[in-house]
A protein has these predicted regions:
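Short, Lys/Arg-enriched C-terminal cap helix and immediately downstream tail that follows
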Residues: 75-76, 83
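N-terminal helix-turn-helix DNA-binding core of bacterial DNA-binding proteins
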Residues: 20-59, 81-93
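Sequence-pattern detector for short linear motifs
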Residues: 36, 63, 71-74, 88, ...
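Amphipathic alpha-helical dimerization/coiled-coil segments
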Residues: 2-21, 38-43, 80, 90-121
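Conserved acidic functional residues
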Residues: 30, 66, 99
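Short linear functional motifs in flexible/disordered or boundary regions
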Residues: 48-49, 66, 106
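Canonical helix-turn-helix DNA-binding module
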Residues: 52-75
Length: 121
C-alpha cells in the first residue's frame, strides 16, 4: 500500500489575475453554460460534483465543450478522479476578480424551457 495518495490531476485554468472579463462574459453568454454555473452555485453549495451530476440531456461531447469553456474562462476548476471529471465553482477567485458577478448568476431566472429539459433545478 502506498504511503501517500497522489493528488488528482487538475486541468489547466487561468489564475485569478489572468481571468479576462470578455472571456468570462462570452462563457456566460450561452444559456446552457449559465444554467450549469447556476446549478453548481445553488445545488452544489460550493462543493465538487462530477459533470454528469448536472443531468443535462446532451451528447457527452457537447457537455465536455461547455465545461471546458467554463473552465478556460476561470469560472470552474476541474480535476480528474480516475476517468471522472470533477468540477467546482471557483467562488473566491471569481468574487475577488469580478465582485458581484456570481450574485448576478444566482439571481438569474432559469428559462422554463431549460427547466423542462432538466438542465437546471
Amino acid at each position: 500500500m502506498p504511503a501517500h495518495v497522489d493528488a488528482p490531476e487538475r486541468l489547466p485554468q487561468p489564475s485569478a489575475a489572468e481571468m479576462d472579463l470578455p472571456v468570462v462574459m462570452d462563457a456566460l453568454s450561452d444559456p446552457i453554460r449559465l444554467a450549469i454555473l447556476h446549478r453548481y452555485l445553488v445545488d452544489a453549495a460550493g462543493g465538487e460534483r462530477s459533470c454528469g451530476w448536472v443531468g443535462i440531456d446532451r451528447p457527452k461531447s457537447t457537455l465536455t465543450h461547455h465545461f471546458r469553456v467554463l473552465r478556460e474562462a476561470g469560472l470552474l476548476e476541474q480535476h480528474l478522479e480516475g476517468l471522472t471529471r470533477v468540477s467546482r465553482v471557483r467562488v473566491e477567485d471569481v468574487q475577488q476578480r469580478f465582485p458581484g458577478l456570481l450574485d448576478l448568476v444566482l439571481d438569474w431566472q432559469v428559462p422554463a424551457a431549460l427547466l423542462r429539459e432538466g438542465i437546471a433545478s
